[in-house]
Amino acid sequence: MEIKSICENKKQFLDLLLLADEQESMIDKYLERGDLFALYDSDLRSVCVVTRESDDVCELKNIATYEKWHGNGYGSKLLHYIFSHYKGKYTTMIVGTGDSPWILRFYEKNGFRISHR
């Protein structure tokens, strides 16, 4: 398994990013200014985008895993990688998400807590 930081041709990951954010126009707003990470296990499994929101806050804008690979821990591995990557750079990482029970469980299992709805 390998996680890569992607600096060029970020739109090549659009099909996967669209699984977590159905509006391409919204993805376009954060993709170029954000940091894109891709997790490979033989081939591409998951991606995420993190943006700087202030000196001490970053935001997880998008995290997606191909559906056939759900439940294999790829999303969690990617989250733990970015936690480590940004440790010391930011004091807070936020995420905005829907209220689907399975996605809330995923984020809570990986250390996020609900601050408001």
Predicted regions located by residue number:
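Conserved GNAT acetyl-CoA-binding A-motif
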Residues: 86-99
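Conserved acetyl-CoA pyrophosphate-binding loop and the N-cap/start of the following alpha-helix
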Residues: 69, 73-81
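A short, internal acetyl-CoA/4′-phosphopantetheine-binding micro-motif in the GNAT/acyltransferase core
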Residues: 63-70, 98
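Short amphipathic alpha-helix that is part of the acyltransferase structural core
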Residues: 1-26
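Short hydrophobic clusters on alpha-helical segments that form packing/core surfaces
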Residues: 60, 82-86, 103
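Conserved active-site alpha-helix within GNAT-family acetyltransferase domains
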Residues: 99-117
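Short loop/turn motifs at secondary-structure junctions and domain boundaries
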Residues: 27-31
